[in-house]
Amino acid sequence: MIYLDSSVALAHLLAEDRFPPEDLWQQQLVSSRLLEYEVWNRIHARRLDRSHGDAVRALISRVALLELATPVLARALDPFPTAVRTLDALHLSSIVFLRLRQQQVRLASYDERLIAGVRALHIPLYGPAVCCKPDVSDGGIGLAHLYPARE
């Protein structure tokens, strides 16, 4: 099972000349309900809902969305081994919640801080770990140089 982070979902939706690995989309995907809000927020901010709305709905329909249940929220209040942002704490808590229920979850992300948090918790990553520095050529989402260019 692959925990899909919004950085990968947005790269798939927005980065036309770059792309996440194709085999990712053949895996069982799960994420926090936050994924839906993060993706739509970015799509609306760029005024792409008309051009990308169907693709967003199709992508989100492929992902099992985990609600922000009390145990997830409670874990997010506890400290993490690395400094994390609020949404990252909720994503990490969701992954921990699944793993405590014997789910073999790996993270697919291009978010450097989220990857650091997962590594500190000894949770495996999907595929090669890819971190990045912000890149303004893709509108500031920091994804343009993460994927191999399409040939």
Show the residue positions of the predicted features.
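Short, well-structured N-terminal submotif of metal-dependent ribonuclease cores
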Residues: 1-35, 42-55, 123, 129-131, ...
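Alpha-helix capping/helix-boundary segments
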Residues: 9, 35, 72, 91, ...
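Acidic catalytic patch
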Residues: 61-94
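Acidic, PIN/NYN-like endoribonuclease modules and their adjacent C-terminal/linker elements
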Residues: 1, 31-32, 36, 99-151
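Short beta-strand scaffold positions
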Residues: 4, 31, 67, 86-89, ...
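Alpha-helical elements of the RecA-like P-loop NTPase motor core of helicases
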Residues: 11, 41, 74, 115-116
